[in-house]
């Protein structure tokens, strides 16, 4: 009897699985999109979900070698496409309707809720318009002062390991500096992460950005319904960390609202205006103030609305920048001719005083450093893949992508295509100087995405990268010490072996 029941249940399960996949399977077959062998129910999950974040990049690369620039993949009922084909990049990133992020972005939702990174539709359009004011050039000048101040703390903290012999994982130092920058820029508060890394908000944020990406590559934790059962302690830790972060952000918002209320009551409050010469002054918390005085359809943003956007800015402004800066320092350390050319540019543009503050205008004159940053993000894009979810059937060239398919544009491999970047594995910043004359396919290089959903904070990110990199190089010579990179894929590109360099104080500073 039990055997009959089990057999019947299995037949029903297989029939259900076949039925829900049938149309997508037929579409893939019609379009001849290749991929690994899929078994009933599990799909291809057993091939990938045991690899871990440190091995998935290599696995994806092997599949590109085997199947070409695009391959399909199944995990349970999820149909996915991985591609490095620029025709897919152009079609998807240029679309004004294909704006829903891939399924993996759902791991961000418990923390970011419906913030700009994961929202869609009218809400996304309205919030995006508000955010453009936060990156006005006058506001950016104020941010540069914040970046410069916290970068000085970073180089001071590096002194104790700058002996020319010790391999230093730069991500640990850069990440804390970036947290100090983004917390002050986003919320107008100083958490002093570089000297107090155990501050509760900082610990909670670091915990969340470790737990959630790790779930993508563990079958027992991948699904929200299974995660609390498979890892109850980790699940409770995640909920606790998110509560700590939300409580902190709520407290900052509440205190700022009260400050504004008192200013209005005594007649000293003056709303921000982009025509106001003082918008970049040190007295302004530009991002939070702009959100507090913003409205959509004549309705002011609620505390919950503001929190999810501040949290989004915190997430995107910490990990992505930290990855970019750390990988740049790693590459510079291993290319002494590049390092020397940057240093000469810094001396020429910023002057010999390593402690002198920098301005936005000076940073914009660092043309070669700009090329170094671009080349770093070509080889080591902080966001190694961009996801979109096709709710409806999609035509790309002669291919038909079935509805309910997540499509992942793998920047990590597209940026290494020899058709667009000769000698693609070589670190050669000059290729971006040459591109000013030669040009290249717009979608061959998209570290900040492209189209309507491109990164709205990219100018902020590049300025911060320039400030942090230039500050380190003005004080220290970088040396090629420590383990080589072992690229690790999660939301942000990391290295399982650390991002290591050695540091030696510049002669004038010894």
From Swiss-Prot:
Signal peptide: none annotated. Pfam families: p450 (PF00067). Its main location: endoplasmic reticulum. It is a peripheral membrane protein. The keyword Heme applies. One of its GO terms (molecular function) is monooxygenase activity. GO terms for cellular component: endoplasmic reticulum membrane. It is found in: Endoplasmic reticulum membrane; Microsome membrane. Its EC number is 1.14.-.-. It comes from the Eukaryota. Its cofactor is heme. Keywords: Endoplasmic reticulum, Heme, Iron, Membrane, Metal-binding, Microsome, Monooxygenase, Oxidoreductase. Heme binds at residue 455. Belongs to the cytochrome P450 family. May be involved in the metabolism of insect hormones and in the breakdown of synthetic insecticides. This is Probable cytochrome P450 4d20.
